Every structure is written in structure tokens, then in C-alpha cells.
Amino acid sequence: MQPMPLLLRQSLRSSANFARTSLPIRPQFLPAAGPNLQPAREIQRSFSVCVRCQFRSQSPLYSSPEKDTSKDDAATQQSKDGSSTLTPGDESAKVEPDAETQRPSPAAGEQDTLQGFYQDAKNEPKRESAEKKGLPSYLEERRSQLSKQFTEMMDNLQSNIFVAGQRLNDLTGYSAIEALKKDIQLQEERLREARQRVREAKNAYAAAINRRSASQREVNELLQRKHAWSAADLERFTHLYRNDHTNEVAEMETQEALSAAERESEEAAAQLSKSILSRYHEEQVWSDKIRRMSTWGTWGLMGVNVLLFLVFQIAVEPWRRKRLVKGFEEKVIEAIEKEKAINHIEILKPQPALTSTSPSSKEEAAEPTPTSTAAGDTPTTDESTPAATDETITSEPVVWDSDPIPTFVTNITAEIATETTEDSAPKSATINGVEPRKSQLSRILPPLPPPTSLDSWRHTLNELFSDRSMVITQRDLTTVALQSAAAGAAIMGLVIALIRPR
């Protein structure tokens, strides 16, 4: 029979091993009630009788991780050394914290479960919205929302347009005329009611007259046969005589009512006509003011057109002319360069053919070599200069289609080639040929005077009234015609405004 401490130790070890082997990968959420409530309470137990075991279980609270490992090693060594001196109660207290430290705390598992639940709860509306987007009810609801928004926008647009019109009427002074219109409508309604009362009063007055006349006729008939009255005739006569005064009073009242209704109708008609005349006068004043404003606006537009015309003629037109001249110069220089390159190629092209024929042709081909070297910007003799000049001048000119520049360009090219061969300029100046071309262009095109001098104005006037031919587009012609018409209208309007008597 084993002693009690050994049995207790074995039972505790077996329970600790069972707890290690049956540990799940992810702790499940424990129910609040049931037969597993007692083990949960045992797992949540975090105290022990042994002070050393308590310190071991709570060592992360008192030290850093590096020191904790050293302390754990020292504690395990001390536990191995002093295992024989421990009491059974100490051993049981030691085994229980080991099992508790190896088992994960249920709070962490519950926290993970709650986090997963919260994530699912957050993602569930997104999934539901994604599923509902394809449903007909969702599309119908979306369409109804869009239609409501469109209706609201249109209502706001109408109100905004009305408010804008009201503000415009306030600025132009038409709001008073609108008030007069409303007053006229009220007066028309009042006149209509007054005329209706006049008709009713006339009918009542006519009825009272008829009633009194009928009573008087009956009285006269009774008086004519007075000698044959019966008791009923006497009572009838008495009744008619008594009602005659009442009929007379009713006739007078209806007559007065008719007169009052007629006076009221006349007053309403007079007030209506007065309001109509006032509205007509105010509308005339408003139309005159608008016409005056439109006249001043027209004059302002005419002035702006005249100012733009003057600015265009004084500032823009010279700048455009200068730009056109500059572009023309660049095009002429480019054409000269192309012509020179073509002439140079034509001069150098026959050399291979001549060298491949015979030795005599080689000797003859040696003669234009100085010319080519002269074209290549090397000094030449006086004998080679005429040949190069003749070849350059007599070379085929470039064919231009419907352009007046070809002869002009070929002449300038011939002069430039002559000057370059005679002067034998340096290599860089001969290749570029800028100075000779500029001199030729300055010789052909007269220099323009400064834009601020009197000669510039004289030159501009001469250009405006010169006989030189120009190519103009339909748009420019239409623009000039419209500007001229606007300027003429402005001048004539100014003259009429000055001459018109006040």
C-alpha cells in the first residue's frame, strides 16, 4: 500500500499530462452554464500556497524577459535540488501552477472570439449591400430616389428662376408696375361685383314698382264697383290700402339701393380707368428708361468696337505686318539656302562620271575642282572664278508652282554666288552665308522707319492707300466690313445725337 503523498503526486501528474495532451489548437468559447463550469473555475485559478511559485508565475510583472529566463533557470535548479525536502502540499502547489502556466488563459481565447464576431458583424452589412445591389427592389428604390432628387432639383430651379426674375424686376423698376397690375386685377373684380349689385338692385326696384302698380290697379278696380262690394271685397280693399304704404317704402328703398350701387359701380370704373392710365404711364416711363439704357449700351458697344478698330489698326496691324515681313525674310533665306545647296550638288555631281571615262576627261575634270573648293570655302585662283560664276548662274532654277518668288530667288542666288566667289570669304562665313543674304535682303527690302517717328505714320498711310496687290481671306474681309459698318453707324449716330433738337 502506497503512502498518501505519493498517490496525491501521481494523481496530480496524470491530471497535468491530461491537460497538456487535450489542449485544443484554438480555445473554444465556454458556455455560461453547464457541467463544464467547475473546470473553468479551476483554470481561472491563479494563486498558490507557495510564495516561490507565486513569484515564478508573476515573474513577468517584476523583471525584463532576459532576467526572467535566468530566474526561471535558477528556480528550476533550486526545485531539482530541494525536491526531496518539499512537503506533499508544496509539491501539489508546484504542479498546479505549472499546469496553469502551460494552459492558455481563457480570456485571450474569448477576446479572439469576440474580435472575430465583431469583424463578421462589420462585414455583414457590406455583404448584404453587395447582394442587394442586383435586386429589382434595390434598383426600383434607387430609381425612385433619383426621380425624387430630379423633381426637387427642378422645383428649386423654378424657384431660383422666379427669384432671379424678381431681382431683375426690382433692379429695372418693373416691380411697381407688377403691383399696379395686381391692383388693377382687384379693381376689375370690384367693378364686376358692383355691376352685379347694380343688376340686382335694378331687378329689385323693378319688382317693387310692379308690385305697387299691381296693388294700385286692383284698388282702382275695387273703387269702380264700390256700389257692389261684398264683405270679401271690403277686406281686400282694406288690405290693399294698408299694403300700399309698405310698397311705397320698399320702392323708395330699392331705388336708393340702385342709386348707391350705380354710384359704387361708377367709382369702381373711374378708379379702374385711372389705374389703367397710371399703369400705361408707368410702362411708358419704364420702356423709355429701358430704351435709353439700351441706347447707351449700344453706344458703349459701338465705342468699344471703334476702340478695338483703332487699336487693331494702330498697334496690331503694324505688328502683324512686321511679323509677316520677318517670316517672308526667313522664307527667302531658306529658299536661298536650298538653291545654293542644289547648285553645289549640281556642280559636284559630274565629277565621278568624268573621272571614269578617260585620262583626258580626268584632266578636264581637274579644272572645276577649284570651283568646288571655292564653294567649299577655300581660296581659289582668278581663273576658276568665272567658271564657277557661270555654272552657278546658268544652273537650272527650282520650279515653283504659282509663286512669284522663283526669279527673285534665282537672281539673289546668282548675286550671292558671284559675291562669294569674288570675295573668297572664310569658311564659316561662306557656309552660313548669313551676311551676304542679309545685305541682299536689306538691299531689296527698304528699311522700315522707327514705329514712333513721323515717317512711320507717313509710311503707314501710304501703305493704306497704296496700289499694291494683297491676298486676303473671306474672314478678314468680313471682319473689316463689319468693323467699317460699326464705325460708320457710331459716327452717324453721334452726328444725329448732336444735331437732334432737344
From Swiss-Prot:
Chief location category: mitochondrion
Keyword terms: Coiled coil, Membrane, Mitochondrion, Mitochondrion inner membrane, Transit peptide, Transmembrane, Transmembrane helix
Mitochondrial intermembrane side: 317-478
Record-level GO cellular component terms: mitochondrial inner membrane
Signal peptide range in chain numbering: none
Membrane-crossing segments per the record: 296-316, 479-499
Membrane topology per record: Multi-pass membrane protein
Region (Disordered): 60-112, 121-140, 350-400, 419-447
Residue ranges that the UniProt entry lists as topological domain Mitochondrial matrix: 500-502
Compartment annotation: Mitochondrion inner membrane
Compositional bias annotation for Basic and acidic residues: 65-74, 91-101
Coiled coil: 139-276
GO biological process: inner mitochondrial membrane organization
Extent of Polar residues compositional bias: 75-87, 378-395
Record carries keyword Coiled coil: yes
Pfam families for this protein: She9_MDM33 (PF05546)
Family according to the record: Belongs to the SHE9 family.
Subunit structure: Homooligomer.
The protein's role, per its UniProt record: Required for the maintenance of the structure of the mitochondrial inner membrane. Involved in mitochondrial morphology. Causes growth arrest when highly overexpressed.
Protein name: Sensitive to high expression protein 9 homolog, mitochondrial
Organism: Aspergillus fumigatus (strain ATCC MYA-4609 / CBS 101355 / FGSC A1100 / Af293)
Gene: she9
